[in-house]
C-alpha cells in the first residue's frame, strides 16, 4: 500500500480487484482460495513461454562485456509446484484465503547466471547492478514506444524500476 502499486500498475490493480470479487463468494459452504503466484517456470503446449521476452532482452547485451540488470530479486516456482499448490488449496481452504506461494528465492544476479549458463553455456557472465535512474530512463523510452503502438502495458515501465530493485521474497 505504501508504494501505491495499484495506482501505478493496471495489472496489480486488476489482481487485487479480482481477489476482492472472488472473496465475496466465500461462505460456510464454499471456500475460495487465491494463489499469489510469482514467476512460473515451465512450458505449456501451444503457448510461447513468458521468459522468451527475457532472453530477447539479454541478447541485446551480447556485444557488451557485461549485462546491466537491477539489484533486486524475486520468488519463483515451477509449473509442477503450481499444480501442487492448486490441489492443496482446493483441498484445504476454508472461507476466503490468499496463499502466497514460493519455492525458490533468487536475486536477479543469481537468476541471470543460471539463464546465461542455459542460454549460451556462459558460467561466469559479468552482471552489473543497473542504477534505478538508468532503469527509469529506459522505462520512459518504453512508455513512448507503447504510446506509439497504442499499447497499454499492465505494468508501468517507469514504476517497474521501484519493484525490480527490491528483493521480493
State where each predicted segment sits.
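Conserved Rossmann-fold NAD(P)-dependent oxidoreductase catalytic core, especially the SDR/UDP-sugar
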Residues: 1-14, 33
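Conserved catalytic Lys-bearing alpha helix of Rossmann-like short-chain dehydrogenase/reductases
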Residues: 14-22
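Conserved beta-loop-beta element that borders a ligand/cofactor-binding pocket
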Residues: 23-46
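Glycine/proline-rich active-site loop of Rossmann-fold NAD(P)-dependent oxidoreductases
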Residues: 42-55, 89-99, 122
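A conserved pocket-lining segment of Rossmann-fold NAD(P)-dependent short-chain dehydrogenase/reductase
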Residues: 56-77
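Glycine-rich Rossmann NAD(P)(H)-binding loop
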Residues: 68-72, 99-106, 116
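Terminal hydrophobic/aromatic helix or amphipathic segment near a protein terminus
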Residues: 108, 112-168
Amino acid at each position: 500500500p505504501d508504494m501505491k502499486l495499484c495506482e501505478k500498475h493496471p495489472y496489480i490493480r486488476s489482481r487485487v480487484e479480482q481477489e476482492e470479487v472472488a472473496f465475496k463468494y466465500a461462505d460456510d459452504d464454499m471456500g475460495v482460495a487465491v494463489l499469489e503466484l510469482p514467476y512460473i517456470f515451465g512450458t505449456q503446449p501451444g503457448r510461447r513461454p513468458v521468459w522468451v521476452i527475457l532472453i530477447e532482452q539479454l541478447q541485446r547485451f551480447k556485444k557488451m562485456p557485461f549485462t546491466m540488470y537491477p539489484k533486486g530479486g524475486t520468488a519463483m516456482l515451477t509449473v509442477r509446484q503450481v499444480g501442487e499448490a492448486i490441489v492443496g488449496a482446493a483441498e484445504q481452504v476454508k472461507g476466503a484465503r490468499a496463499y502466497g506461494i514460493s519455492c525458490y528465492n533468487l536475486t536477479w544476479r543469481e537468476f541471470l547466471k543460471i539463464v546465461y549458463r542455459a542460454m549460451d553455456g556462459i558460467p561466469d557472465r559479468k552482471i552489473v547492478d543497473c542504477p534505478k535512474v538508468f532503469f527509469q530512463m529506459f522505462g520512459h523510452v518504453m512508455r513512448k514506444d507503447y504510446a506509439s503502438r497504442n499499447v497499454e502495458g499492465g505494468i508501468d515501465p517507469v514504476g517497474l524500476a521501484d519493484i525490480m530493485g527490491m528483493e521480493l521474497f
